[in-house]
Amino acid sequence: MGQVMLVTVLLPTRHRTHLVERTVRSLLDLANDPAQIEIAVAYDEDDTESHDYFTSTSWVTLVADYGAELQVHKTPAWGYQDLHNYYNLLAGRAQGKWLLVWNDDALMKSAGWDTMVKQEQDYMGMLHMITENYRPKFALFPLIPQKWVDLFGSVSLSNSNDSWIHHICLEANAIKLIDAVVFHDRADLTGNNLDQTYLNRTNQKKLYKSESMRQIRHEWAQRLIEYRTQL
């Protein structure tokens, strides 16, 4: 284990290297201290485009020029139905005190967003950044402490990772709003990035809403409540 960072950005991707470069630049350009940011990428083992990019000098140099940390993982092609597998793998290797559940089609809009996280770095719960173009009251890109993974063993058990975290923290009354703003450049919201990666998304809402999954989320919320009362 290396240096402890402030934030690890959890970033799974497939066939979208141009979006990865854009989103990473948005995060690091607007960070007050990019040297405290770790970019953690996961890509599928059959994704040759990503393999070529993430093993290139241009990618390594892009991150290094900001002084940020970097890790890249080639994974099984789990697919969107098991999106949580990517986040869980990355979280298990993250060096950040905080974990940002991020997408390659997201853009950071707020300067000093990392300072906002640092100001709340001892909070045990979810930090909520506003998504300016979609459901601002819902945490589409949640920040959770590494202690979350210590407590539960994973980020999420559902490919609806944002909903999983948000609903648990909502029940536990463990949500804190910060002033950072994100733009989600998703195909159904903006008309952009209507590619095969987007089209291959599979809806798991029925499973997410099942009684068994509801019960697990409730149990996690109760464990979070108990943990917070001991602080």
Predicted regions and their residues:
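Short, acidic, metal-binding catalytic loop of nucleotide-sugar glycosyltransferases
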Residues: 25-36
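Short beta-strand/loop segment that forms part of the nucleotide-sugar
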Residues: 35-48, 73-77
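A conserved acidic beta->alpha catalytic loop
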Residues: 41-59, 107
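Active-site nucleotide-sugar/metal-binding loop of Leloir-type enzymes
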Residues: 87-98
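Short beta-strand-to-loop acidic/aromatic patch adjacent to the donor-nucleotide binding site
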Residues: 96-107
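Conserved donor-nucleotide/metal-binding helix-loop-beta segment in metal-dependent transferases, i.e.
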Residues: 111-126
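Short beta-strand-to-loop element that shapes/binds the nucleotide-sugar donor at the catalytic cleft/hinge
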Residues: 125-141
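C-terminal catalytic/acceptor-binding lobe
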Residues: 163-231
